[in-house]
Amino acid sequence: MLRRLSAIAILSLYSAGALASDAGFRPSFHPDQLKGPPVGRRNEVLVLGTAHLSGLPNTFEPAMLEPLLQRLARWRPDAIATENLSGLQCDFMRRNPSRYAESVETYCFDTDAAHVATGLDVPSANVEMERLLSTWPADPTAAQRRHLAAVFLAAGERGSAQVQWLRLPVQDRITGDGLDAALVEMLDKSLTRRNETNLLAAALAARLGLERLWAVDDHTADSPTPPEDEKAAGEALMKAWDNPQANARRDADKPLYANIGKVDGVLDLYRAYNRPGVGLQAYQADFGAALAEPSPQGFGRNYVGYWETRNLRMVANIREVLGERPGTRLLAIVGASHKGYYEAYLNMMHDVQLVDAEAVLR
């Protein structure tokens, strides 16, 4: 009996030691230290943390983005990635409504009108979009731009359709070539719609002569909270987010938002959101606080798992763009809380060189 107990005790010690060793393990392979390529133009990525423009005070006007647009234009990106879902991802999510119905309603562009106007569903419109872009002329006609805009809308790529609309002279923003009156009205209204995709990404792309945007957001990690847990989960997370770091973050935003209408007020906001330390502040206020949330159901850990998965998939989408187009200079515009995660994950890639946003925004 004693021998058996001793054996159990020894096994327990070995198991505890293994767990302790696992907890302290650090891999010897560090891809961030193995950068390339040795020849050829590097892939460069500038991550621009942004406020969501729809949440700015009424003193904000789109013209106030001009100092920011000028600085980004001087950097001259070849590609611009936005915090939007691709049409193909939304098509997938629509086919799985039991899990994604709420996410589709919140994040996905309704392509029904474009489907009727063009006869193309989302998958076939994406095929046509790629075909058109692969043989796109250096000097397209207005009719070609209108047709591509219609195809982009049918493909669920609303931001890219906006780029084509902006590249058309005002007198050529008319119906025809796949665009009916409803789609033209939609594109016209989007010219002044207060979000960073239209007012920043599409405007910059058109200014630089680019033909499209890259929608890299991902919501496939979304899942509905069981109804019986909704109240408890909400209360647990709200309690976690009521912390000194979150309060300090909100207090720091107040003067930035109050001064939006002043000269360089918008630029000052972007400078603040792209300073070193922003990622750690977001972690301490939000994700780190959620990770420490003590509910037995692990509500905070659920949230952090979703957040990390989403950011990994967003970065994977960016890496795919770079992998297919070596030597690309890419601007990634994303909510400021994502910035630290974007940069940390992108920096792990062999063929990605990060660019300091602070230097670009000076």
Predicted regions span which residues?
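Bacterial N-terminal signal peptides that target proteins for export
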Residues: 1-6
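N- or domain-start disorder-to-order transition segments that initiate the globular core
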Residues: 21-47
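Low-complexity, serine/threonine/proline-enriched polar segments
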Residues: 103-170, 247-288
